[in-house]
Amino acid sequence: MTLYKIVSKPIILLAFFFTRVVFTNEVDGEELFYKPTCHSDTYEIILKKFSSIWILVNTFILLCSFSLFLKYWCFKTLAKETVKGY
């Protein structure tokens, strides 16, 4: 077995796979988008998906860390200003 035969089989399989992929421009609900009843400026939040739960957890962690930082920073500034007078 030559190196060409070993390497060429996966490459041929990948080429076959990528040439068989069909790309479409269809979007779900596209026919309703241009109708007057469509409200494209509203977005329905679905909390059943993993990504939406994950972003809520990340937002909560970010807000908690930001509040702890501000609490520390304000306490540090208050203590520094209080001690400065003595």
Swiss-Prot record:
Keywords: Disulfide bond, Host Golgi apparatus, Host membrane, Membrane, Signal, Transmembrane, Transmembrane helix, Viral envelope protein, Virion. The keyword Membrane applies. It comes from the Viruses. Its main location: virion. This is Envelope glycoprotein N. It comes from Human herpesvirus 7 (strain JI) (HHV-7). One of its GO terms (cellular component) is host cell Golgi apparatus. Residues 69-86 are intravirion. The keyword Signal applies. It is a single-pass type I membrane protein. Interacts (via N-terminus) with gM (via N-terminus). The gM-gN heterodimer forms the gCII complex. The lineage of its organism: Viruses, Duplodnaviria, Heunggongvirae, Peploviricota, Herviviricetes. Belongs to the herpesviridae glycoprotein N family. Residues 30-47 are virion surface. It is found in: Virion membrane; Host membrane; Host Golgi apparatus, Host trans-Golgi network. Envelope glycoprotein necessary for proper maturation of gM and modulation of its membrane fusion activity. Also plays a critical role in virion morphogenesis. The chain crosses the membrane at residues 48-68. Residues 1-29 form the signal peptide.
